[in-house]
């Protein structure tokens, strides 16, 4: 009977530890990339076309940069992404917003005034089309004292700008297309 039992019990431990290590690495990878996949899915759901990293004229002041501009069934949507982890304290009237995480505290300027400037710049180009803007905080951010006006989560963005009736959305999109082409012509850094 002894000849059937393994002589060295550690010979099974090493492969088991290796499998557990690989499984842990895979789970960490999945967790880190799931947010990016979800972001891509929501962007594809709300946007029928998209321009990233464009520069548009802004009145007499020169130019302004826009990170993400979407053609949606409701018009044009400007999205600024804030990838912060922790509790965010901010309001419409506060000049600086604070983030408190487990290991640090920091502040950043209220992003709403610059978003209003971006909305105005795009509105000047596509005058007859609704232009909205949202500051998108990803899943690591939590607002415990109320959410400022233009702030949105991924779920809220999908709910507000997603369109269930794809046929009706297509008609609206076709009406917005000439204005979308205007923004493409006016923009620098965007594909033509």
Task: List each model region and its residues.
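Surface-exposed interaction regions that form or flank ligand-binding interfaces
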Residues: 1-64, 70-76, 85-87, 101-192
């Amino acid at each position: 009977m002894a000849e059937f039992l393994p002589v060295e019990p550690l010979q099974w431990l090493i492969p088991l530890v290796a499998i557990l290590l690989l499984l842990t690495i895979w789970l960490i990878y999945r967790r880190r990339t799931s947010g990016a996949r979800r972001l891509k899915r929501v962007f594809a759901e709300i946007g029928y076309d998209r321009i990233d990293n464009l520069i548009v004229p802004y009145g007499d002041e020169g130019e302004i940069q826009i990170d993400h501009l979407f053609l949606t069934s409701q018009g044009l949507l400007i999205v600024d992404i804030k990838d912060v982890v922790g509790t965010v304290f901010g309001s419409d009237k506060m000049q600086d917003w604070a983030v408190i995480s487990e290991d640090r505290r920091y502040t950043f300027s209220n992003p709403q005034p610059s978003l209003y400037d971006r909305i105005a710049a795009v509105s000047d180009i596509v005058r007859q089309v609704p232009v909205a803007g949202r500051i998108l905080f990803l899943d690591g951010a939590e607002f415990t004292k109320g959410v400022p006006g233009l702030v949105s989560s991924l779920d809220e963005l999908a709910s507000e700008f997603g369109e269930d009736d794809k046929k009706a959305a297509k008609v609206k999109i076709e009406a917005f297309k000439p204005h979308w082409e205007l923004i493409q012509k006016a923009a620098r850094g965007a594909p033509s």
